[in-house]
């Protein structure tokens, strides 16, 4: 191979999953064993959040956090919080594409692992499995962008400093 071919390959966008792992998980059953005697159907609340951080040049950790709180009447049956993480090698990606990659593609890869781990711990705790529904991380990402733009507008800046997925500056 010539030096020119090597340089061209080195400049190509590169995305690789280095590792997927369960970073943290907790289960609380504050009203057990009495809660198992309740006959009323439980209410379920689910919250999902995404965070990303750069570990070193081109290496990023993305964490998808899921919290499931189940109550019978006003008593908490259980609360599960899990942090499913992944380490991603991302190089030669244009800056305007990096944030959507970290906020959409990486969480989409991690979420099935999070769902499985949460369902497993709930079942092992003696409760009926709760299967979390799919999440459209693109819509979630766009909602966060919109909220950030509205916050910037409220602060009074003409240029929010937010870069849209197409690379343009967000303005109000």
From Swiss-Prot:
<dbReference type="GO" id="GO:0051082">
    <property type="term" value="F:unfolded protein binding"/>
</dbReference>
<dbReference type="GO" id="GO:0051262">
    <property type="term" value="P:protein tetramerization"/>
</dbReference>
<keyword id="KW-0143">Chaperone</keyword>
<dbReference type="InterPro" id="IPR003708">
    <property type="entry name" value="SecB"/>
</dbReference>
<dbReference type="GO" id="GO:0005737">
    <property type="term" value="C:cytoplasm"/>
</dbReference>
<keyword id="KW-0653">Protein transport</keyword>
<dbReference type="GO" id="GO:0015031">
    <property type="term" value="P:protein transport"/>
</dbReference>
<dbReference type="GO" id="GO:0006457">
    <property type="term" value="P:protein folding"/>
</dbReference>
<protein>
    <recommendedName>
        <fullName>Protein-export protein SecB</fullName>
    </recommendedName>
</protein>
<keyword id="KW-0963">Cytoplasm</keyword>
<comment type="subunit">
    <text>Homotetramer, a dimer of dimers. One homotetramer interacts with 1 SecA dimer.</text>
</comment>
<dbReference type="Pfam" id="PF02556">
    <property type="entry name" value="SecB"/>
</dbReference>
<comment type="similarity">
    <text>Belongs to the SecB family.</text>
</comment>
<keyword id="KW-0813">Transport</keyword>
<dbReference type="InterPro" id="IPR035958">
    <property type="entry name" value="SecB-like_sf"/>
</dbReference>
<comment type="function">
    <text>One of the proteins required for the normal export of preproteins out of the cell cytoplasm. It is a molecular chaperone that binds to a subset of precursor proteins, maintaining them in a translocation-competent state. It also specifically binds to its receptor SecA.</text>
</comment>
<keyword id="KW-0811">Translocation</keyword>
């Amino acid at each position: 191979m010539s030096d020119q071919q090597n340089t061209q390959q080195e400049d190509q966008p590169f995305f690789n999953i280095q590792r997927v792992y369960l970073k943290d998980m907790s289960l609380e059953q504050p009203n057990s064993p009495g809660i198992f005697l309740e006959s009323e159907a439980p209410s379920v609340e689910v919250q999902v959040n995404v965070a990303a951080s750069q570990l070193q040049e081109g290496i990023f950790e993305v964490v998808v956090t899921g919290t499931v709180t189940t109550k019978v009447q006003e008593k908490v049956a259980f609360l599960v919080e899990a942090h499913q993480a992944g380490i991603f090698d991302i190089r030669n990606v244009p800056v305007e594409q990096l944030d959507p990659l970290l906020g959409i593609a990486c969480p989409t890869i991690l979420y099935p692992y999070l769902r499985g781990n949460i369902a497993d711990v709930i079942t092992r705790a003696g409760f009926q499995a709760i299967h979390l529904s799919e999440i459209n991380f693109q819509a979630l990402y766009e909602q966060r962008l919109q909220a950030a733009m509205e916050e910037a507008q409220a602060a009074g800046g003409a240029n929010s400093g937010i870069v849209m997925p197409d690379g343009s500056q967000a303005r109000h």
